[in-house]
Amino acid sequence: MSEKATEIANLLSPTVESLGLELLGVEYLPAPGGATLRLYIDVPLAEQPERVINVDDCERVSREVSAQLDVEDPISGNYTLEVSSPGVDRPLFTLEQFARHTGESAKIVLKLAQDGRRRFQGEILRIDAEAEAVVFAVDGKDVQIGYDNIDKARIVPDWVALGLAPQKPNKPGPKKPGHEKKKPSNESAAGKPRAE
C-alpha cells in the first residue's frame, strides 16, 4: 500500500473492527477529477467460511467510515468511497495475508524491477519474516521478493477447484437443423437432373 493508503488504513481499521469485520487493506487512487478510496473488508478468519461479506456489511462500513472521514478529513479534495469484499481474486496487502494464502498462486506487480521484470505470477511458497520477504515459485525457480517492493498482489483463483472452469465438450454435439449435406444445384428435389 502507498503511504497515504497505509495512513488511512491505520485510521479506519478500529472503526471497521468495531463492526465485527476486518479491514484487509486500502487502495488510494488519486486522479485529477477526484480520488478513489477503496476499502476491502472481510469477516474475521474465525467466522469463515460460515459467514461471508454481504451488501449490508459494505453499507454499514461505508456509513461509519464516511462519518469518520468527514471528521478526520485525511483526504483533501473530492473523492469517491468504495467498500468491497475481496472477491475470489482477493488483493493481498500484508505479510500475514500472504502467509494465509501459502500454496496459492498470485500475480504480483513490483515497484522496482527485479531480474529485469516488474510482473510475476507464481505460487506463494513461504514468508521470510526475518528478511520481510515473500518467496514465490516462478517458472520452476524460487524467487524471493522484498515485501516493500510489492506494489500490488492478487490471488489467481483456481477455477477448476472452485468448480467454475469452463467445460469443453468431449464429443461433437448433435447437428443443427439446416446443416444437412446440400444437393448439387443441377438436381431437382426429387433427385433427377434438371433440363436446362
From Swiss-Prot:
Signal peptide: none annotated. The keyword Cytoplasm applies. Residues 173-182 have a biased composition (Basic residues). CDD domains: YlxS_C (cd01734). InterPro entries: Ribosome_maturation_RimP (IPR003728), RimP_C (IPR028998), RimP_C_sf (IPR036847), RimP_N (IPR028989), RimP_N_sf (IPR035956). SUPFAM superfamilies: YhbC-like, C-terminal domain, YhbC-like, N-terminal domain. It is found in: Cytoplasm. One of its GO terms (cellular component) is cytosol. It comes from the Bacteria. Pfam families: DUF150_C, RimP_N. Keywords: Cytoplasm, Ribosome biogenesis. Residues 164-196 are annotated as: Disordered. GO terms for biological process: ribosomal small subunit assembly; translation. Required for maturation of 30S ribosomal subunits. PANTHER family: RIBOSOME MATURATION FACTOR RIMP (PTHR33867:SF1). Belongs to the RimP family. NCBIfam families: PRK00092.1-1, PRK00092.2-3. This is Ribosome maturation factor RimP. It comes from Xanthomonas euvesicatoria pv. vesicatoria (strain 85-10) (Xanthomonas campestris pv. vesicatoria).
